[in-house]
Amino acid sequence: MALLLVGGAARLALGARLDVVPGLGVTLGLGAAAVAVPVSIVFALGGDATHAVVGVLVVAAVAWLSSGLVTVRRERGAAALWRWVRRAVAATPLDALAAAVVLAATVPLLWHGLTYWTTFSNDFPSYAASVEVWAAGPQGGAAFLERHPDGFGEYQHWRAHTAKPMATALLLLASMVTGLPGAQLLAPATVVLLFLLVSTMLAVTAVVAPGRRWPVALATTAPLLSVVPLGRVYDAQLGQAAAAALLAVVLALLAGSGPPARPWVAASAVAVVLAAAVGMNPTLVVGSSVAVAGACVYVWGRRRRASGALDLRTVVLGVIGAVVLSLPFLGDYLGLGVAEADGTGGYELPFPSPAALVGLQRTVDDVISPWAWTVVVLVVAGYVLYKRKHPGPWWAAVAAGAAAANLALLVHVYGLQSYSVHKYVALAVVVVVPLLLARAVGLLSAVTRLADAVAVVVALGAANAWVAATQVPVVVPDDLWALAGDRRVEQVPVLNVHVSNAYEAPVAATVLGNERIVVTQLTYAPSHPPVGDWALIHRDWWDLGPLDEVIDLNETYQLVRFGLTEVSEGERLVLDAAHPEHERLLYGRWNRSTRGELWGAGEQTWLAFALPDQLVGREVRLTLEGELDLEDGDRLRAEANGQPVDVTAPGSSGEGRIVVTVPADATRRDGDRLTVRLFPDRDGARIGVRVETLEVRGSSG
């Protein structure tokens, strides 16, 4: 309702200055952009994002009230007020089709309730953590770091200030309106964004594609049911879904009309929506800019002769305005672009089949069949023959050519099966393909029973989407949400999260209300050594050390009081693939190479274990045999239980021994625990450590 309030106010404010195409999705999109941009800018400039949300809602309410008063003065009666509401909401019969498409694609997921689900990625908990930072006010970052004194906290604090600000703003709005934590809002956010996308694309093709309405509408929905773009939805990629939806709203604005004497109104609307789309997922939108530009040219070309159609000057002004609105985030966007420039982010995915263009690819992993490419060649040939008999601008060729050129560029840089290419294809399938398919079906509308054939394709696509939604492998159980507010858990001042599941760990760290929370397992952030004596675990799953007390919380989780694994004096631990149990001593970002070598990498790396009683209060030497890799000129530093200690190493790089000498006062600072941190002497530098063996001895041993 909040997006409808703001979006309706935007339509009322634009009024006669810009005739925006009707559609409930377009209204919601205007609302999303009108919230995301100012709220994000306020946060970026050091203001209170929650106050900005309230301010936007108040302005929207005032706009509704003032417009309503004007309507009542001009036209009396309930009928006039009803027309006024309908004009602001702008719903159409096509929105019913959009709702049906959304339900077909999401009902199996909605059945899980207000929880977190995903296929492979773990991004959504980061959005939820960003909402926690934003909701805490201008000093919320410091409070968040105090509550999360670990790698998870550092990573999420960085992300809240740098990554996808517009998506965070939308989720913050939803959290404030519903009173629910951001981590529980995946399902409603997904439904709204997917409806926004489908409804808006239906509104656009209804204007730019000729022919009978329902065959054109069905043709529009076929690509939107493809498992390739829906795979991004099922992967809980909120930013990608929002970016695609708002790019569709940009097309809707270009399909509208306005007085030529006031291009700044339309340009301002384009600027706000385009800036919001970029802020939802900067690398996706910028990386797809050639295809998006082609789609915009197509819509503009199809509408250029309509009365009051927007001219190129308006579009250019809108793009310039979007750049200006993005200036507060420009450094962050560039940083994200540099970080993802090598294309190594994400995981490899098979290149989609052409069947995905009409929703007929059954799964994301389908192997491409030769017949699919044959159909593509025949379609292109048919288009060329049509244009030879019907001369005119080749707008469809511009859109398709731009999308193909964009694809070729990304494949050249990243490879055919890269994650970057796959998410681009997902965007192109929902932004470019519906335009072309709707145009083709519109031109063929005289063909007998064409609507029936298109309906069959859509039904098959809906079936594929339904099956894919039922196969999402990761669903956070309701038992986790039940722990929020559980006094047995929240009375523990410092809680370690060690639930064995990297998807559940960041959710638990976000929704639980303990004074301090430490994530002791690797997520997108490095793991951190345990702090304190209590941990949340999966029932009967534990690998860090002896248990002193076990409290059953529910069927899935336990609260345990624990100690760390003890390393005896003189015991030589071998950290090879044959002894995985020894890896429980290592924290940070450790991975085993293809040769079986165990490497720790990042800005720091940790070891944590328990000392035997005879070594507590004595000076000890920790010896690591392996290899050190530092940047030229950097030196290795070490801390033990938070205290700087002496360390010797084989220069800045090379094989040999790393010896950490821990004084007696450090070994008694934390009971029998010894937590050692290795890091470079230069801030921001990175360290690589390969460990073969570990040994602890007293100073006289």
Indicate where each model-derived feature is located.
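Membrane-interface helix-loop-helix junctions at transmembrane boundaries of multi-pass membrane enzymes
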Residues: 86-93, 207, 211-213, 260-264, ...
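Membrane-embedded helix bundles of polyisoprenyl
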Residues: 27-39, 100-106, 189-258, 263-295, ...
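Active-site lumenal/periplasmic loops and adjacent helix-entry segments of GT-C-fold
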Residues: 93, 97-98, 104-245
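Transmembrane alpha-helical segments
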Residues: 110, 280-285, 406-413, 439-440, ...
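Hydrophobic/aromatic-rich transmembrane helices and adjacent perimembrane loops
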Residues: 122-125, 132, 240, 286, ...
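Extracytoplasmic
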Residues: 131, 459-532, 660-661
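Membrane-embedded, hydrophobic transmembrane alpha-helices
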Residues: 1-89
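Alpha-helical transmembrane segments at the extracellular/periplasmic loop-to-helix junctions
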Residues: 1-5, 323, 329-331, 345-394, ...
